[in-house]
Structures are given as structure tokens and as C-alpha cells.
Amino acid sequence: MVFLCKLHKYQFCIFCFRLKINNYEFDFVCQITPELETDGTPKKFFPQERYDNKKNLNLNKYGKGPFCKFSIDRKYSLKTGVYVILVDDLIEYVGECDDLFKRFGMGYGNISPRNCFEGGQSTNCRINSNILTAFKLKKSIQLYFLETNDRFRIEHELIINLSTSWNKTSGKPSKIS
């Protein structure tokens, strides 16, 4: 359940830069904006074309592309916790990480060629593609973060409670201590 800001009465308070979900207060990280061409359209990348596919692997379900590139501020290096991606103020994805900067700068925001193929990180491809699609549809894409060591439990709880459209699993319940 998402609550209104008690101070300003907004669900996603632009004044507090906070988002309250259940009893957790997430801090605003950034607006996700892909790298752009001079005409304002997102640059498209096809990293799978750079992969030396010696084992003749097939592309994974989300590996075809195109993909985009984006990053977040380096100050989020080594920040452990739970993040949410909102598209036009709807929570579309909940995830956990042990380093938010790496998750977005080197995971979702910069697709490595190997991840496009079977056995690679297909989630990175899927989330990047979803972000690119949302951006091309002129939707607002925001990232919020909750710093916590209880990331597996909170991620699982929120995915179950929110039924987010981009999550394909319920997190990692086996890692909940």
C-alpha cells in the first residue's frame, strides 16, 4: 500500500523527495534518462553484436535489443538496500542490491554483450528494454531507494504486496534470514 506524504498530502512528495510504501520510506535517487542523440531521441545500442560467440549461444528472450545507456550518481556506490522504479508514478519494479551504483551503472544501465545470450543476466536486458520503451513513450521514469540490510525480506514483501508488472519472480525468499 502506498501512502500520502503527511506533511504535503502527496503520494509521491516532490517536496520531501520521499516515497512511502507500506512502512518504508524510500529516498528519491534520480529521474532515469537514457543517453540522447542530438535530436533528443534515445541512443540505441546493440551490444550483442560485439560478443565473440564461440559457443554459438542463442540470444536470451530479452537479448535482441535495442538497449539504452544511463547511469546514476556515484555517491550510491556500496549502498545496500531495496529500490523501486516508477513509471508515470506507478511502481513497476522492486529490486534489491548490495551496490546501487553498480546495479544501475553496470547492470541495467549498460548492457554487457554476454548478458544478451543464454546464461547471461536476462533481467538486466529486460529492465533496460522496459526503460527504453517507457522513455520513448514520453513517460517519467524515477528511481527511489531504501538503504537497509534487510533487503531480501523487504524486496519479497513489496513484490508480493504490490504485484508489480516488471517483476517476474517474488525476489529471493530463500535468502531471508
Question: PLM ranges: what are they?
Answer:
Residues 1-92, 96-177:
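Boundary/linker segments flanking structured domains
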